[in-house]
């Protein structure tokens, strides 16, 4: 980008949006191939392509913000609005899953045995692994806030410790969720209960993985001295996203695990 005499967000032409779209197409096509033909070749190609695009796109954004100084206060304001709108759209995305769940559970059809959970489905105990996962995500919300306060106070060492702990809690949550899926007595094919449960909690789990990846990039940037007390929107966006994931989990726990069981 040539030298600019204004504070507005004018980006260079970038190949990453179209490459990202192609990688997403490969990934979703690969999922279909995996589901129907048990072939993971296309899915692996899609995931690797997506990872490469993410790394190079992040590299460009880091260069523009940290080294070229293009993320002026005006640009940061626009990025904040963008992140708020993105999180709002994600909230409506999950609203659809809650709608499907309550539509099915509040008036169970004769095909479900006229009851909820449906006949033959043994729900998970909400006081076991789900409760532990709730405690883990709430604790991670505390540690990410601790990291944010440490950055604003210029305490880099403490921020690194807090952010590392947050990431470890995120991966611990993912491991427990995978174990829970493996040990569940029902599958995604077991009536509308299995469908809504696995789709809603599965997409939430995907968001936890995305948030953990986002925070990991922030940790690497923090170690490399990219953040200052006044200039750390990359971390702020990741923290907002992480708090959103926390809140969605609380609604999932209260509705699908506790009330729905």
UniProtKB/Swiss-Prot annotation:
Primary enzyme class: translocase
Main localisation: mitochondrion
GO biological process, one term: respiratory chain complex IV assembly
EC number in record: 7.1.1.9
Record-annotated membrane-spanning stretches: 16-34, 41-66, 73-105, 129-152, 156-183, 191-223, 233-256
Residue numbers on the Mitochondrial intermembrane membrane side: 35-40, 106-128, 184-190, 257-261
Membrane topology: Multi-pass membrane protein
Residue ranges that the UniProt entry lists as topological domain Mitochondrial matrix: 1-15, 67-72, 153-155, 224-232
Annotated compartments: Mitochondrion inner membrane
Keywords: Membrane, Mitochondrion, Mitochondrion inner membrane, Translocase, Transmembrane, Transmembrane helix
Disulfide-bond pairs as recorded: none
Reaction it catalyzes: 4 Fe(II)-[cytochrome c] + O2 + 8 H(+)(in) = 4 Fe(III)-[cytochrome c] + 2 H2O + 4 H(+)(out)
PANTHER family per the UniProt record, alphabetical: CYTOCHROME C OXIDASE SUBUNIT 3 (PTHR11403:SF7), CYTOCHROME C OXIDASE SUBUNIT III (PTHR11403)
Family, per entry: Belongs to the cytochrome c oxidase subunit 3 family.
Subunit structure: Component of the cytochrome c oxidase (complex IV, CIV), a multisubunit enzyme composed of 14 subunits. The complex is composed of a catalytic core of 3 subunits MT-CO1, MT-CO2 and MT-CO3, encoded in the mitochondrial DNA, and 11 supernumerary subunits COX4I, COX5A, COX5B, COX6A, COX6B, COX6C, COX7A, COX7B, COX7C, COX8 and NDUFA4, which are encoded in the nuclear genome.
Protein name: Cytochrome c oxidase subunit 3
Biological source species: Gallus gallus (Chicken)
The gene coding this protein: MT-CO3
């Amino acid at each position: 980008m040539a030298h600019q005499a204004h504070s507005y967000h004018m980006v260079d032409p970038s190949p990453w949006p179209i490459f990202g779209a192609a990688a997403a197409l490969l990934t979703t096509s690969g999922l279909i191939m995996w589901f129907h033909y048990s072939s993971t070749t296309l899915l692996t190609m899609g995931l690797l392509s997506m990872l490469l695009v993410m790394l190079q796109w992040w590299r460009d954004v880091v260069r523009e913000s940290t080294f070229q100084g293009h993320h002026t206060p005006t640009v940061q304001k626009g990025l904040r609005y963008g992140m708020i709108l993105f999180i709002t759209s994600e909230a409506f995305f999950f609203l659809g899953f809650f709608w499907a769940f309550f539509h099915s559970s509040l008036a169970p059809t004769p095909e479900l045995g006229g009851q909820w959970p449906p006949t033959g489905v043994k729900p998970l105990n909400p006081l076991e692994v789900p409760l532990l996962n709730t405690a883990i995500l709430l604790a991670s919300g505390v540690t990410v806030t601790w990291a944010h306060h440490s950055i604003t106070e210029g305490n880099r060492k403490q921020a690194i410790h807090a952010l590392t702990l947050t990431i470890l809690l995120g991966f611990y949550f993912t491991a427990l969720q995978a174990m829970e899926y493996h040990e569940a007595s029902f599958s995604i094919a077991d009536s509308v209960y299995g469908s809504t449960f696995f789709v809603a909690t599965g997409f939430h789990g995907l968001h936890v993985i995305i948030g953990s990846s986002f925070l990991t990039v922030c940790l690497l940037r923090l170690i490399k001295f990219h953040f200052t007390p006044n200039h750390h929107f990359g971390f702020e966006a990741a923290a907002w996203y992480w708090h959103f994931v926390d809140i969605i989990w609380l609604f999932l726990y209260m509705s699908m695990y506790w009330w729905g069981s």
